[in-house]
Amino acid sequence: MIITSIPDFSLQYDEPLGLLRVEWASGDDMRTFRDSAAKLLLLVRELGVRHMLLNMNTLPDISVYDQVWMGTRWMPHMAKSSLERLVLVIHRRRVHNQLAIDSLIAAARPLIHFDIQYFPQPGPGLHWLSDYSVRLPALLAEWEALHSPNAATPPSANERSPFYRAGH
């Protein structure tokens, strides 16, 4: 299910998997980042999200002020959420955000009770989060239909990942 309640984010939720996919959708405009991040936290709580993918590749460089806010206001609440697993998608060339995220996680590590994994692309991260669920191709198709310039034939919906195990 595509969620449109937070305009700064592209959001997709699958209730049976307890999986929320999150991507920044406002380009370089970070003026409403804090408000949207706070709304995201409320959504995670409201839905009882267990597995979340945050695509950090779509987020501009996080300012020092936003990093401090996240570390003091946002991370402590996220650490108390229902999350069991978190995937952070970040390309190795996104050094600024990689360092910012590493710093935030290090500071909040004593509070965090969920598994955190890094992936360079969303596909493998979604496979891991969903335990290679048979629901994943439909979720990928739904996402591609919304985000792909060629929505008629979503390429990744029918492709099997090298990590895919049939029957799960």
Where do the model's predicted regions map?
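Amphipathic, Lys/Arg-enriched alpha-helical "gate/interface" segment within cytosolic domains
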Residues: 1-168
